[in-house]
């Protein structure tokens, strides 16, 4: 689930955020924080008429122009920009913490919080998600009842399991896990802040997202639109229309 990490040594004129050029990750996180998705409940594409997407692209573009957000060319540069002082903060899934905590010299220099809420968008929140993993029981399962019982007694029923795997770097957002003593432990790297309990709390407040088989087609189309807007100054409305039509074509509509 999405978090915002902020360095405690902000320098005047330093960008607040970093992002990989052409990647729609931050835009998607902002979109979900507003309770909006790239698809409607009936599965139709929701890009052109999305009430939050254009304002989000406008905000993103403005942040790039005024230097609030710095774009880098690839993932390695993205990670480097977080750790070498290029940027004062980062918004991403909680898994991004591992790229910071791997560097001992960063200990005590970072704080964790939720993400900013967009103004002027009904339903906007301070919470979102990016990435993660899920367990599912497929229709090919030969012992469905046994599989369901296993899931209920482990991943959906055992705080002891989550207490054990947190020490191995596996962070769950199952709400009851956040109430355990293991999750409430202070984390020295983050100045003894109980960041794991915080993250689970954030997860319980995150709006849902409508995905589906063509979700990444839609993400990629928005990423292309974003890249064209930032790099060539392309017209935003035209780019959103093209993105919508691209996804609809891929869906066979």
What are these regions (language model features)?
Residues 75, 92-97, 133:
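Beta->alpha turn/N-cap motifs
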Residues 113, 165-221, 228:
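Long, aromatic- and glycine/proline-rich binding clefts that accommodate carbohydrate-like moieties
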Residues 1-6, 42-72:
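Glycine-centered hinge/linker elements that transmit conformational signals in sensory
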Residues 84-93, 108:
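Alpha-to-beta junction loops
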Residues 1-45, 87:
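Extracytoplasmic/periplasmic solute-binding protein
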Residues 62-68, 103-170, 204, 224:
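Extracytoplasmic/periplasmic substrate-recognition and gating elements
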Residues 15-16, 36-55, 102-104, 117-127, ...:
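Short, solvent-exposed loop/beta-turn-alpha elements that line the ligand-binding surface or hinge
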Residues 70-84:
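Short helix-initiation/N-cap motifs at beta->coil->alpha
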């Amino acid at each position: 689930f999405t978090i915002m990490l902020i360095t405690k040594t902000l320098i005047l004129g330093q960008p607040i955020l970093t992002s990989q050029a052409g990647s729609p990750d931050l835009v998607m996180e902002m979109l979900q924080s507003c309770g909006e998705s790239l698809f409607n409940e009936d599965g139709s594409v929701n890009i052109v008429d999305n009430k939050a997407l254009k304002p989000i692209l406008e905000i993103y573009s403005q942040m790039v122009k005024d230097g609030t957000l710095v774009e880098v060319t690839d993932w390695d540069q993205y990670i480097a920009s977080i750790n070498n002082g290029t940027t004062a903060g980062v918004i991403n899934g909680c898994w991004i913490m591992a790229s910071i905590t791997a560097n001992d010299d960063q200990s005590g220099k970072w704080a964790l919080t939720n993400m900013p809420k967009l103004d002027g968008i009904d339903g906007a929140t301070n919470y979102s998600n990016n990435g993660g993993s899920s367990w599912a029981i497929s229709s090919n399962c030969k012992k469905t009842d046994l599989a369901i019982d296993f899931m209920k007694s482990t991943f959906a029923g055992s705080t002891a399991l989550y207490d054990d795997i947190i020490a191995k770097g596996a962070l769950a957002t199952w709400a009851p896990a956040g109430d355990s003593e293991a999750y409430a432990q202070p984390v020295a790297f983050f100045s003894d802040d109980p960041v794991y309990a915080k993250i689970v709390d954030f997860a319980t407040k995150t709006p849902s997202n409508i995905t589906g088989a063509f979700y990444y087609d839609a993400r990629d189309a928005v990423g292309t639109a974003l890249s064209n807007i930032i790099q060539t100054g392309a017209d935003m409305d035209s780019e959103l229309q093209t993105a919508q039509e691209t996804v609809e074509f891929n869906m066979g509509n």
